[in-house]
Amino acid sequence: MSIQIFNTLKREKQPFKPLKDGEVKMYVCGPTVYNYIHIGNARPIIVFDTVRRYFTYRGYDVKFVSNFTDVDDKLIRAANELKLTVPEVADRFIGAYFDDVDQLNVAKASVNPRVTENMDEIIQMISTLIEKGYAYESAGDVYFQTKKFKDYGKLSGQELSELQHGARVEYNERKQDELDFTLWKAAKPGEIFWESPFGNGRPGWHIECSALAKKYLGDTIDIHAGGQDLVFPHHEDEIAQSEAATGKTFANYWMHNAFLNIDGEKMSKSLGNFITLHDVLKDNDPNVIRFFMLSVHYRKPITLNDAILEDAKNGLERLMIAYQNIDHRIQTDDGEYVEEAHEDEWLEQLTELKQAFEDDMDDDFNTANAITTFHELAKRANIYLAKETVSINVLREFLSMMRLFAEVLGLKLENTQTDSLDDSEVEALIEERLQARNERNFARADEIRDILKEKNIILEDTAQGTRFRRG
């Protein structure tokens, strides 16, 4: 099965066919760095990092570009409030961005271009649009002539006539038409600006991504991605600008993730439920946040609350405990083997699980199903560990496959928070020990007791069941 991608442009799943065999050119819209990013921004960051990881796993060379918008109205306001320059604000929050997403185990982009460091390319694209008759100057501003681009609306599925009828935009006498959008803003007194053939000013938001994608990936790219809120107008405008400037298809596949809601409501400052990723990471394991984000298919809305995060924590712990138990068993292996036929049977099961995982990810990167398959792998690992004798080959294959699944999903299976176990991890091991004793696998039961003893946890077997205390 080839990788299938739901293409927003075509409104259906399509088999992925790269522009060049073995390569993927991918652009993801990055943040405007005037503050810490909110927790909803973390969803596309994690989702499309995982998409990239899977392409890499499948043997593709991925060039992954994600920009920083480091000048716009929000940055200018933040600079005034913080009594800093715009570059100082941008530097502060780009640093904060990397501090936060590094905790989420997000791989570094091939390039993270800043708008302000690529102004020549932006000005050149605007000049090209003017020369081709798609843009016009007006009192120091430059606007894109929307109606001249006949395919406008093809991504969002909106007709120009419908947009005209339903337009709710502030009247601007500088525009020839209310649907025209800004490519270049004339500088206001006291604002940061760049010199250009159109006068001093700075770029509009939409033109930035078009110019950066062209510079770093070329006229046509494989995949352009972002949150569903960017479909219109941002990505629609990007298509218009890029295709008008080059005469070529801008992107072959468009991917968009659904919103993250807080307790069922869309996050917004007006509702008072606006939460930054920075604050969430103060109280939560970033590994759990990543697991949570991947537990629902990226095109479905996802809800964040304490109960759901607790479920994610427990789900991740089950995987971590299975992994750590296998690793411990390998480290203490005494060379016992099962019959060869049984070994082959288990190895065949593992091959089937690997294929199931790939099928899940091939199906529009269905991480929710992939995690279900991951849990099935952990379940079978626990069953195998409960056997009196095991094959070191099978154990190593279990460990290797768990590492493989974790690498694709960007999850960490080692206990990164602390060397100790929390209560739920201890209880899971106690339950496994009870199962081993019921099956008269006393060697495994003693092994679990030893694992807990190493963590300074003492078990007490009573008539009411096994209790534990920390030594």
UniProtKB/Swiss-Prot annotation:
Gene Ontology biological process terms in this record: cysteinyl-tRNA aminoacylation
Annotated binding of Zn(2+), by residue: 29, 209, 234, 238
**Reactions catalysed according to its record:** tRNA(Cys) + L-cysteine + ATP = L-cysteinyl-tRNA(Cys) + AMP + diphosphate
Single GO MF descriptor: zinc ion binding
Q: Name one GO cellular component term.
A: cytosol
Residue interval(s) of motif 'KMSKS' region? 266-270
Details of cofactor binding = Binds 1 zinc ion per subunit.
Task: Mark the transmembrane ranges.
Answer: none
Q: Which domain of life is it from?
A: Bacteria
Where is this protein primarily located? cytoplasm
- What is the main EC category here? ligase
Q: Which UniProt keywords apply?
A: Aminoacyl-tRNA synthetase, ATP-binding, Cytoplasm, Ligase, Metal-binding, Nucleotide-binding, Protein biosynthesis, Zinc
CDD domains under this entry? Answer: CysRS_core
Swiss-Prot/TrEMBL cofactor(s): Zn(2+)
Assigned EC number: 6.1.1.16
Q: Output the SUPFAM superfamilies linked to this UniProt entry.
A: Anticodon-binding domain of a subclass of class I aminoacyl-tRNA synthetases (SSF47323), Nucleotidylyl transferase (SSF52374)
Subcellular localization is given as: Cytoplasm
Q: Where does ATP bind?
A: 269
Sequence motif 'HIGH' region, location on chain:
31-41
Q: How does it assemble?
A: Monomer.
* Record-linked NCBIfam families: cysS
By sequence similarity, the record places it as follows: Belongs to the class-I aminoacyl-tRNA synthetase family.
- Name assigned to this protein: Cysteine--tRNA ligase
What species was this sequence derived from? Listeria monocytogenes serovar 1/2a (strain ATCC BAA-679 / EGD-e)
- Encoding gene per record: cysS
